[in-house]
From Swiss-Prot:
Keywords: Coiled coil, Phosphoprotein. The modification Phosphoserine is found at residues 98, 126, 131, 252, 254, 267, 276, 341. This is Smoothelin-like protein 2. Residues 87-111, 123-142, 151-312 are annotated as: Disordered. Residues 131-142, 290-299 have a biased composition (Basic and acidic residues). Belongs to the smoothelin family. Residues 225-244, 300-310 have a biased composition (Polar residues). It comes from Bos taurus (Bovine). The gene is SMTNL2. The modification Phosphothreonine is found at residues 96, 272. Residues 24-88 form a coiled coil. Residues 348-455 form the Calponin-homology (CH) domain. PROSITE patterns: CH. The keyword Isomerase does not apply.
Length: 458
């Protein structure tokens, strides 16, 4: 009895194990199928990637070959440029040793001619604005060197001649420091200023120079150095040629000298030749007040706007008109207004030109008298005559009547629209409503449109 249940239980266990093994085999089989499907998908993607990467690899190889070819060409061009530079002398030869640079000076010589040219061009452009100052400084240093050398030579002379002046003047030569005017910069900048500014500058410059130069020590120097007066007076004032060169050609040298002499009657004539003895010093009060006034006048003259030739002529005419005080005042003013408005077409002139053109086209037509752009066009006959002058076969003008206004407007507008492609900017009803005095602007606008379309058929 006990063996039967054991056998039944063993059979049940074997059946359960069989079912479990079958389930495991099915799961493993499904897993193998999934792995095979995944492998096939991966293989397909790898094959597609290889298929796409093939042209890319070929392109990369071609680019590498092109790069090598370009490098070869670049090397060849470099050698050609170097040989060209050697033939033209723009660069030193590689085998020839360059001279050693000076001690303390860096070697900044460029290797190619283009770099040297660019550096020179940059230097010239950047230094152009400072050329005047450099020139002034160079001239000032040259004058100072000349005066210092002259003073040293006179100071170290073992003996002085009787004609050279008293020994007091010789001993006081190295003591004073001469002022440093810049006549070169003054003459260079004067042509850009008005004539009044030029006069004020020269007047102030001569006044201040005389006030500074004619001190007691300087007077002794000027009186003592009779053997070399040009060296003593040259650094102080510019020459008359330099002053006169800055003025316009309309002012002569004699006129400028007279003007300067008349305004500086109290100051010594420093423009005269240096052999003339200096005049006595004016009072100190006059010298104290006049430079300030002249400086204010100089600032006022320099702030004036630069006038052109036309503006100068206009100002001259206006001044002449004020001076005449009514003589020919109306005629001159009319001429000035006409000259000011010359070349500017006004609305009235355009209307007059268009009206003259309409008169020339409607000359000889009956019932047409063009005097304006209002009542002369009120009956429609002017429109019909203008269109008929360009298209005489379109209609019979002699059959029209000024009393039939609506018919005239309709005929003229229709023919202009059909034959000249001119749109109706005015309606017939509007012309009928406006009566015998239509709006001049409406009529002028439509006539201007007719002119633009009809002139093509002239």
């Amino acid at each position: 009895m006990e063996s039967a249940p054991d056998a039944e239980e063993a059979r049940t266990v074997r059946e359960a194990l069989g079912r479990y093994e079958a389930a495991l085999e099915g799961a493993v089989r499904a897993l193998h199928e999934d792995m095979q499907g995944l492998q096939r998908g991966v293989e397909q993607r790898v094959a597609e990637a290889l298929r796409l990467a093939g042209p890319l690899a070929r392109t990369v190889a071609e680019l590498q070959r092109d790069n090598q070819r370009l490098q070869t060409q670049l090397e060849r061009l470099t050698r050609q440029v170097e040989s060209l530079g050697l033939t033209t002398g723009l660069a030193p030869a590689p085998g020839t040793p360059s001279p050693p640079p000076a001690p303390g000076v860096p070697n900044r010589a460029p290797r190619l001619g283009t770099a040297r040219f660019a550096s020179h061009a940059t230097f010239s452009l950047s230094g152009r604005s400072q050329s005047l100052d450099h020139h002034d400084e160079a001239s000032e240093l040259e004058m100072r060197r000349t005066s210092n050398s002259c003073i040293i030579e006179n100071g170290h002379q073992p003996g002085a001649d009787p004609g050279d002046g008293p020994p007091e003047a010789t001993q006081t030569i190295p003591a004073p420091e001469p002022p440093k005017p810049r006549p070169v910069s003054l003459s260079l900048r004067l042509p850009h200023q008005p004539v009044t500014a030029v006069t004020r500058v020269s007047e102030r410059f001569s006044g201040e120079t005389s006030a500074t130069a004619l001190s007691p020590t300087s007077a002794a120097i000027l009186g003592g150095l009779s053997s070399s007066p040009s060296e003593a007076t040259t650094p102080w004032t510019p020459s008359p040629s330099e002053k006169n060169s800055s003025l316009p050609r309309s002012l002569s040298s004699s006129g400028f000298g007279a003007m300067t002499a008349s305004r500086n009657n109290n100051s010594p004539p420093l423009v005269t030749p240096p052999q003339s003895p200096p005049s006595p010093q004016p009072p100190a009060t006059t010298q104290a007040h006049r430079p300030g006034e002249r400086r204010r006048e100089l600032v006022r003259s320099q702030t004036l706007p630069r006038t052109s030739g036309a503006q100068a002529r206009k100002a001259l005419f206006e001044k002449w008109e004020q001076d005449t005080a009514g003589k020919g005042k109306g005629e001159t003013r009319a001429k000035l207004k006409r000259s000011q408005s010359f070349g500017v077409a006004s609305a009235s002139s355009i209307k007059q030109i268009l009206l003259e053109w309409c008169r020339s086209k409607t000359l000889g037509y009956q019932h047409v008298d063009l005097q304006n752009f209002s009542s002369s066009w009120s009956d429609g006959m002017a429109f019909c005559a203008l269109v008929h002058s360009f298209f005489p076969d379109a209609f019979d003008y002699n059959a029209l009547s000024p009393t039939q206004r609506r018919q005239n407007f309709e005929l003229a507008f229709t023919m202009a629209e059909n034959l000249a492609n001119c749109e109706r900017l005015i309606e017939v009803e509007d012309m009928m409503v406006m009566g015998r005095k239509p709006d001049p602007m409406c009529v002028f606008t439509y006539v201007q449109s007719l002119y633009n379309h009809l002139r093509r058929f002239e």
